[in-house]
C-alpha cells in the first residue's frame, strides 16, 4: 500500500513538472516574458522609439572573432549558456568532497535581453547576458571558462528602437539607419556601434518577438 501511494505521488509530481515545462515552453513560443531585465526609466517615447536611462547592471560577456553577426552569435550564446547553467564556481556555497569542502557550481537564472554589438577590433563581436540584480562583481559565480568576463555596466542613456520579426544582417542595417535618423531628428548625439537586444528564444513566433537596436547617447 505504501509503495502504491509513493508511486502515485511520484507520478502526480512528475505530471506537475512536465505540465509546468509545457506551459513555460508555450509561453516562450507566443512571446510571454517573465524574465528579469536591467532596470531603466523611459525619458521619452515616440511610437517604437524611446530614450532610456539605465541604472548600472552586471553582465557576463564574451568576445568572438568573425565576419558577421550571424556567423558568431551561436558560438557566443553557447559559451554564455554554459556559464549560467553551471560551468562556474559559486562564491557563496561549497560541497563536502572526500572530507574537505570544495567550491560548488551554481545555476544562474536566465535574464533578458541577450545583447550583442561590435568589439573594438576589426571583425570582433561582443555578446552579453545581464545577470540577476541580486549579484555584484564580488558575489556573482566565477566563470570556469576564461573567455567569459564579468563586468559592471555603468549608468548610461540609450536611444532604442523596438521591433518584431527577424534580426538578419540586412534587417539590422535598416533598423540602425531608422534609429540614427530619429536620434538626429531629436537633436541627440550618439556614439559607438549599434547594440542589438533579443528578448525571446529562437523558437518564438517571429511576429511576436521583442527585438531592439540601441545606441548610446553621448555624455
Task: Indicate residue ranges for each PLM-predicted region.
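A solvent-exposed interaction/effector surface
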Residues: 2, 6-14, 18-219
